[in-house]
Design a protein with these regions (language model features):
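Short, well-ordered beta-strand segments in beta-rich or mixed alpha/beta enzyme
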Residues: 21, 66-80, 119, 170-174, ...
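Short, glycine- and small/hydrophobic-rich beta-strand elements in well-ordered beta-sheets
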Residues: 49-70, 98-112, 200-225, 242, ...
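An N-terminus-focused feature that recognizes amino-terminal "leader" regions
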Residues: 1-64
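Short amphipathic alpha-helical segments
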Residues: 34-55, 92, 186-211, 247
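Short loop/turn segments at strand-loop or loop-helix junctions that form parts
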Residues: 20-28, 171-177, 266
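Activation on folded, globular domain regions of eukaryotic proteins
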Residues: 19, 35-44, 244, 250, ...
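Hydrophobic, ordered structural segments
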Residues: 26, 62-164, 234, 265-268
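Surface-exposed interaction/gating patches
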Residues: 130-215
Length: 278
């Protein structure tokens, strides 16, 4: 039994904690290590990554960051905040004291969408109002069954995602405006209006199915912004395209506030070490 499993746990009622970690490498400190010490340090990080990935219900993405904002990044998903914190400390020290200098971090949780269409809404708005189907009809019931299956899969991805090893990883935090010097206040807007705005946003997102995998994690009360957005893609063109197109949706144009964007490249560990000059 590992140290993490013996410790008390802090787990949300549903979903996982998500921790984004970004570091710069102190190459001056790294250069003070002998060749054998450097090899030992890289072996230590490699073994730690393997250990974390073998931990129950846990995923760890590793990537080289493409700008001087950072050199290396990690995205950790795990239910237990105590385990996440322990892994974070070990990752920070994995190459030796003071080699990895934290430059940015973000804590959030996977969560359901507040604006997901319910079974009742789908039946009334789509099956009856739009398609003219009658409750109890064979086509009506088949459509409801298909909707239930689709929403179960969607909710599973929101709460317990399986993230692929697609090469491009984009992360940015965001919040919704709440008035002040702005005309628009998301939190003063009626729910039905907010739902319609988010429905339009979702329509834009579906155009990128198979090109972009998006994970929205909530961070109200946990970190500086209200959500963390992680995008996985095969190239940066699709990242740029979806972010640009969504900026024209009213929900972003009127209410969106965004933090810095971080772009990383998921690579095999040997290539990752070469990419960050270790």
């Amino acid at each position: 039994m590992t140290q993490e499993s013996q410790a008390p746990s802090v787990r949300p009622e549903e979903g996982w904690h998500v921790l984004h970690l970004y570091y710069q490498i102190d190459h001056a400190q790294w250069s003070t290590l002998s060749r054998d010490e450097q090899l030992e340090a890289k072996t230590n990080l490699t073994e730690l990554i393997q250990e974390i990935r073998s931990f129950p219900e846990t995923q760890l993405l590793t990537f080289a960051v493409t700008t001087p904002k950072a050199d290396i990044g990690f995205m950790l998903l795990t239910p237990d905040l105590i385990a996440a914190t322990h892994f974070e400390k070990r990752l920070t020290l994995s190459l030796g004291a003071d080699v990895l200098a934290p430059t940015y971090s973000y804590l959030s949780q996977t969560e359901r969408s507040e604006y997901t269409t319910t079974r009742e809404q789908y039946a009334a708005e789509t099956l009856v109002a739009e398609k003219g189907l009658k409750e109890g009809a064979e086509e009506y019931e088949a459509a409801l069954t298909e909707f239930d299956e689709r929403m179960e899969k969607y909710t599973q991805h929101r709460l317990y995602p399986v993230l692929p090893a697609w090469p491009v990883v984009c992360f940015y935090p965001m919040s919704k405006r709440r008035g002040g010097s702005h005309e628009y206040n998301w939190y003063g807007t009626e729910y039905d209006d907010r739902r319609q705005l988010m429905k339009g946003h979702a329509t834009t997102g579906r155009k990128y199915s198979g090109k972009i995998l998006q994970l929205i994690s909530g961070s109200t009360g946990l970190d500086e912004h209200e959500w963390g957005v992680t995008l996985l893609a095969h190239d940066t063109y699709q990242i740029k395209a979806i972010v640009y197109e969504m900026r024209f949706d009213d929900v972003s144009a009127r209410y969106g506030e965004f933090g810095d964007f971080y772009i990383g490249l998921q690579l095999p560990l040997d290539e990752l070490f070469r990419r960050i000059c270790l």
